[in-house]
Amino acid sequence: MGVTVENISAGDGKTFPQPGDSVTIHYVGTLLDGSKFDSSRDRGTPFVCRIGQGQVIRGWDEGVPQLSIGQKANLICTPDYAYGARGFPPVIPPNSTLKFEVELLKIN
């Protein structure tokens, strides 16, 4: 249970966000069957959030700090690190494992 980081392409390997940092990220969120439920890329606007402060799901709070600037990776988040038994109706069913393709664009 938790979050698994699967590297797609390397970042700079030395600049990592710290808890409390604001980050700018592009992401595509899918269910394990490939159904897309959200995408900053489709909106054409990167997502900005503060990491490690409960503003996003736990999988992001723990997974994003493992990425360096420019890195693209999949974050596989088990339900307890995503939306849990509640899900996010009507888009995300209860107890769903989620896959986010994320790209860390910058630390603000």
UniProtKB/Swiss-Prot annotation:
- Primary location recorded for the protein, binned into one broad class: cytoplasm
The UniProt record lists the keyword Ion transport: no
Activity regulation (UniProt): Inhibited by both FK506 and rapamycin.
Alphabetically sorted, this entry's keywords are: Cytoplasm, Isomerase, Rotamase
| UniProt keyword Lipoprotein present | no
EC nos: 5.2.1.8
Which reactions is this enzyme annotated as catalysing? Answer: [protein]-peptidylproline (omega=180) = [protein]-peptidylproline (omega=0)
Q: Any idea which GO molecular function terms this record carries?
A: peptidyl-prolyl cis-trans isomerase activity
Return the Pfam families for the record.
FKBP_C
- Name of the top EC class for this enzyme: isomerase
Q: Which InterPro entries match?
A: FKBP-type_PPIase, PPIase_dom_sf, PPIase_FKBP_dom
User: Ranges for the PPIase FKBP-type domain?
Assistant: 20-108
SUPFAM superfamilies reported in the protein's UniProt record: FKBP-like (SSF54534)
Q: Where in the cell is it found?
A: Cytoplasm
What's the family? Belongs to the FKBP-type PPIase family. FKBP1 subfamily.
Question: What is this protein's function per UniProt?
Answer: PPIases accelerate the folding of proteins. It catalyzes the cis-trans isomerization of proline imidic peptide bonds in oligopeptides.
Name of the protein:
FK506-binding protein 1
User: What is the organism of origin for this protein?
Assistant: Cryptococcus neoformans var. neoformans serotype D (strain JEC21 / ATCC MYA-565)
